Amino acid sequence: MKVSAVLLCLLLMTAAFNPQGLAQPDALNVPSTCCFTFSSKKISLQRLKSYVITTSRCPQKAVIFRTKLGKEICADPKEKWVQNYMKHLGRKAHTLKT
């Protein structure tokens, strides 16, 4: 009886710490740097430091502006002001790496 209890404990511990137990289906594996809503207000250009463009793994294309205070703000890349700000902040496109 004691042997079977020990074996059961070992089996449960092995299952709990198995990396496959932590795996998630790809459908649920959404990168944390995706935008699901866009800022409804135009941001002051003077507050911005940089930007990145979300990856193709995100459900919608977006621009993430980073402020000088470290805040991240999602914006719609189709908006004219967003395109102008991207040009002003740098000609090189900044894309997030997956």
Curated annotation (Swiss-Prot):
Its main location: secreted. Residues 1-16 form the signal peptide. GO terms for biological process: antimicrobial humoral immune response mediated by antimicrobial peptide; cell-cell signaling; chemokine-mediated signaling pathway; chemotaxis; cytoskeleton organization; eosinophil chemotaxis; inflammatory response; intracellular calcium ion homeostasis. Disulfide bonds join 34-58, 35-74. This protein can bind heparin. Belongs to the intercrine beta (chemokine CC) family. This is C-C motif chemokine 13.
